[in-house]
């Protein structure tokens, strides 16, 4: 009975290791050793960021369901994207912990528009594209701060085609600094099962609530993680383990 129990326990342990959480993609906006994009300040801020770790892309160029964020040819007047100093918050593994220089992506209010008191980037969205093939239970975490006149709300939505979207989470109460422990500085959201095993998955972030041209949200150290979906054979082995344990009692 003891041997059977040990066998069952060992088998379950092996199977559990096959469905443990794993990294899909990470953006620290600095590391280039694995082919990722290093963030530049305006007017050279990129509109496409290849993940610094794992596999995925972040779009701010009007493709894949994203908005085309404005950036001037010279200077920073009315820019809607920029780069600023970052944080170590939510940086794990090989992610960069350098916080000086250009380390955090900023979405900025942009030019004043009609009606009075509104700004160009309000209502615009950036989109992450990645694969959930063989994966389930997506979790997204990141560090975020806002300036006093920066965006007050980030609406997260998900899609499997980049056209039809479902709500995932609404982030409010964004802190005015990256200081650890501040409400919503590190925001973690679990996404509904709609992306489970999707060959192509999209996460869209829409920004609203900016009240000045330079008000912004600064974001750093995005992590996309998920669980491996057990293969049919692994599920069958779980049943075998349970049956063995019952018969030996």
Regions found by a protein language model. Give the residues of each.
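Short, threonine-centered small-residue motifs that mark membrane-proximal processing/anchoring sites
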Residues: 2-8, 12-23, 222-243
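Surface-exposed, low-complexity/disordered Ser/Thr/Gly/Pro/Asn-rich loops and linkers
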Residues: 57-133
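Terminal, low-complexity interaction segments
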Residues: 26-40, 51-52, 147-151, 165-228
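Extended extracellular/luminal ectodomain segments enriched in beta-structured repeat modules
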Residues: 132-141, 198
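Conserved Ser/Thr-centered positions that define the repeating blades of beta-propeller domains
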Residues: 156-159
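C-terminal membrane-anchoring or membrane-association module
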Residues: 244-249
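Extracellular carbohydrate-recognition regions
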Residues: 21-78
